[in-house]
Amino acid sequence: LRRLHRGEPVPTGLIPIGGLLGIGFALAPDDGRDLVMVVSVNGHGLFDTVTGEKIARDRDPDPDPDPDPDGSIPDAVPDLSCPGLGPIASARVRIAGLFGGGLHTTTEDGWTLEVVSPEWPHDRVLLSADGGIPHNGPHGENWWHIFDSNYSELRAAGFSPSGHTLAVATSSDETLWSHQAPDIKRSAGQFGRSPADWGAQSQLV
């Protein structure tokens, strides 16, 4: 993992998710770690946010031609949710992306995520520890430009409810960063006050 600007995490590779529509978070029932549900034109997938491991996959979810509160397609139900897979099959996951919804933009320990578009239609994602715009100090001190969607449409950006995972999803890929949870062994990232404390974990297919 290369790091720039006092530890800013920089993704080291790109693995596409063709036709990504949206993402949502859930908690693993066994140890409470963050999981991410990915919805695309090629089906639904559930991934570990730390390792990038694909935990479960549904390549052909029910298309739900009629509105159904228990439907499989997020835009077909009022709360933009879809059924969970694998270990969270008994739950529904709210999805943020092309059809609406949103992820958390702040964490309890003071991180803020913002999306700005100075070169519209391209979006930029900013991570800060100073409460957000207007930023206090120069770039690289208390705020960082961590992502530029100049190659694909931004679908969603934000934190998991736990605050342990940061995700940026576009129409072609997803990038995850992870905090160190005290009770979960992680491969990178520790709590702290600079992006060095967010390890860029994976870009999922």
Regions found by a protein language model. Give the residues of each.
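WD40-repeat beta-propeller superdomains and closely related acidic/aromatic-rich repeat-like regions
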Residues: 1-205
